[in-house]
Regions:
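Secretory targeting and sorting signals
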Residues: 1-26
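Hydrophobic alpha-helical segments within soluble ligand-binding/sensing domains
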Residues: 89, 145-170, 208-210, 255-259, ...
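Extracytoplasmic "Venus flytrap"
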Residues: 44-70, 74, 79-90, 108-111, ...
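Bacterial lipoprotein signal-peptidase II cleavage site
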Residues: 19-39
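Flexible loop/hinge segments that line or gate small-molecule binding clefts
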Residues: 112, 116-153, 256-264, 268-269, ...
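Hydrophobic alpha-helical
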Residues: 90, 106-122, 189, 203-261
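Short, solvent-exposed amphipathic alpha-helices that sit
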Residues: 58-73, 154-158, 180-198, 212, ...
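Hinge/cleft segment of the Venus flytrap/periplasmic-binding protein
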Residues: 12, 23, 43, 192-193, ...
Length: 327
C-alpha cells in the first residue's frame, strides 16, 4: 500500500497549486454543465457521479467541490445524483448507463445492492471508478480505480491513539444502517482498542443522535471515549457529553468548520481525515485521463486519500483549507 499512499500524497501536493475556492452546493440533485474549457481536442465528456449522500450531510459538499473543480478544468459535463437508499442509487447508476454517459464515478457503501448495476457499464464501453466506499469490492464490479481511505486501517489508527491516551471504554457511533464502510471503521477501532461498543443512531435526525448519545453516557459513566464517524455527528456528541456532564473525550472522522473550532477549543481530540475534496477531484480527473490518454492510477491497487490525522498540532495550518471547503 505504500506506493498508492505515496501517489495520493503527491497528487495532493500538486492539486494545492491549482485549487481555487469552491462554493458549497448543499443538497442540489444535479450539476448541469459544470464546464469551463480545457477538454482535450475540444470534446466535452459527460461524467455521472452517483453517491449515497443523505439529506443534511455537509460532508458531500467537499466531495462535490473537488469533482466540480476537476470538471471545470477539463470542460466536463458533470452530472451529479444521489440517494441514500441503495436500491434507488442502483437505479441512478442504470439511468446513467442508459443515457450513454462517457464515464461513471460511484460510491459503493452497499456494494451487493449497487454493484450489479455498475457492472453493466463495462460491457457497453463506459469506464467506471469507485470512490469513498467500496475498497474491497470495486474490482468485482468492473471499476478500474478506487480513491478513498482504507477504512479498516483508519479505524485501527484511531483505536491505537485511544489506547495510547489511556482510554478505558469507547462507544463507536454508527449513523447509517447498512453502510459497510462505517461498520469497518468501528471494527478497526475495536481491533486496536478492544473495549469498544457500537451504538446505532439515525444520522438524519441530529436531535435524536444527541439524546441517544447522552442517554448512553448517563447509563454508563465508564465510557471514556466517543468515536463518531461524521463531522455532524461529532458536533452532536460534543453537545451530548456537555449536557450529560461527562468527561468522555470525543474523536471523529472527517472535518467541518464546527469540528475545526472544536479541535481548536479542545472539545474534540482529533479528526481522522479522508480528504473528501481529493476523492471527488480524483474520481473525475482519473476518468478524464482514462478517456483522453488511456491512463489509470494506482497500478491496479486502491489510491489512498487517508487516513491522516488533524489535531491540535496541525489544525491551524489546515483550518484555512477547511474554510475554503477543500479539506
Amino acid at each position: 500500500m505504500f506506493s498508492t499512499r505515496k501517489l495520493a500524497t503527491a497528487l495532493t501536493a500538486g492539486l494545492l497549486l491549482v485549487v481555487t475556492a469552491c462554493s458549497s452546493q448543499g443538497g442540489a440533485q444535479n450539476t448541469p454543465g459544470a464546464s469551463g474549457g480545457g477538454a482535450a481536442g475540444g470534446k466535452s465528456f459527460a461524467i455521472a457521479m452517483i453517491t449515497h449522500e443523505a439529506p443534511g450531510s455537509t460532508f458531500w459538499d467537499r466531495i462535490r467541490a473537488g469533482a466540480e473543480q476537476a470538471a471545470k478544468q477539463h470542460g466536463i459535463d458533470l452530472r451529479y445524483s444521489n440517494d441514500p437508499d441503495s436500491s434507488k442509487q442502483a437505479t441512478l447508476v442504470q439511468n446513467a448507463i442508459d443515457s450513454k454517459v462517457d464515464g461513471i464515478a460511484v460510491t459503493l457503501a452497499n456494494a451487493p445492492a449497487v454493484g450489479p448495476a455498475l457492472a453493466k457499464a463495462e460491457p457497453v464501453g463506459i469506464p467506471t471508478v469507485v470512490f469513498n466506499s467500496g475498497i474491497d469490492s470495486y474490482q468485482k464490479y468492473g471499476a478500474t480505480m478506487y480513491f478513498g481511505s482504507d477504512e479498516s486501517l483508519a479505524g485501527q489508527s484511531a483505536g491505537t491513539r485511544l489506547a495510547q491516551a489511556g482510554g478505558g471504554k469507547a462507544i463507536c457511533i454508527v449513523h447509517e444502517q447498512g453502510n459497510a464502510s462505517l461498520e469497518t471503521r468501528c471494527a478497526g477501532v475495536k481491533k486496536s482498542f478492544a473495549n469498544t461498543e457500537n451504538l446505532q443512531v439515525n444520522g438524519q435526525d441530529l436531535p435524536s443522535v444527541q439524546s441517544t448519545i447522552g442517554a448512553k453516557l448517563a447509563q454508563d459513566p465508564s465510557i471514556s471515549d466517543i468515536v463518531t464517524l461524521d463531522a455532524g455527528i461529532a458536533t452532536a456528541a460534543v453537545q451530548a457529553k456537555t449536557e450529560a456532564n461527562s468527561q468522555a473525550k470525543v474523536v471523529t472522522f472527517d472535518l467541518s468548520p464546527d469540528v475545526v473550532k472544536d479541535i481548536q477549543g479542545k472539545q474534540i481530540e482529533f479528526s481522522v481525515d479522508q480528504q473528501p475534496y481529493l476523492q471527488g477531484y480524483l474520481a473525475v480527473d482519473s476518468l478524464w485521463l482514462q478517456l483522453t490518454n488511456g491512463n489509470d492510477m494506482g497500478g491496479g491497487q486502491p489510491v489512498l486519500t487517508g487516513p491522516s490525522f488533524v489535531d491540535a498540532a496541525n489544525i491551524d495550518k489546515i483550518a484555512g483549507f477547511a474554510a475554503n471547503n477543500t479539506r
